[in-house]
Amino acid sequence: MSGHPTVRDDPDDVMVRRAATVGHRMAMGPGEPALTEWAAAGLALPDETAMMRYRLDRIVAQMADDDLDGILLFDPMNVMYATYAPNMQVWLLHNQARYAFVGADGRLVLFDYPGCGFLSAHNPFIHEVRPATTFTYFLSGGRTDEQAGDFAAEISDLLATHGGGGRRLALDSSTTLGVTALQDTGISLVEGTRVMEEARKVKGPDEITAMRCSLEGTRVACGKMFEAMAPGMSENQVWGVLWAEMLA
């Protein structure tokens, strides 16, 4: 594995300065050595703020095409697309404890763990962060029905306020309990995975720029892996080189 120099925070970085005063940070985007490698390859950096704006606009436009009043997202990939704010992506594939609502009027509400507002503070297009109301057994125990009812009532209120006047809500995934609770409020559910796939498949200019940077990072990492390969190495050792380079 290559010995990358220690990455040092830029004291002029807005998030670094903020972290010094509020005691936490969520730094999105690349650091060294990727920045130097991309500059050497003649690659520009994406405008992340413009990318966040574009993605929200894509979701709203797709909802308009499908005559939807809102969309509720549980899939961590879709939540990330809408909010550009990650949190326990793999764990949330099993426990639906974080979700996002987008209204027909463009209102974006992220439901996150209490005290986790800093994870999305970099996104100016998230209008509100609320504590998630969880209804999976792991998190709610014997109160799953009660919690599901509270969850559905909150989403129903959002749909009434920020929808297009109807009750059509797209939903990408949920448990049977979540689906039933939403329907009990009079919401008409629509399959939401297709809606998000249609929105996400049209890439904006900054997304394409980001993809070029990502591909260059992958090319460099694979090159380091090939250089490190030697007789007698295990697959895990070779794989470790790749991941060390990808995550550096």
Question: Where are the language model's segments positioned?
Answer:
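A composition/biophysics-driven feature that prefers long, compositionally simple stretches
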Residues: M1-V220
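An alpha-helix initiation/capping motif
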Residues: R53, D172-S173, G232-A244
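Short, small-residue-enriched loops and turns at beta-alpha junctions
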Residues: E197-K201, M229, M233-N236
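Short, intrinsically disordered, charge-balanced linker/junction segments flanking boundaries
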Residues: M246-A248
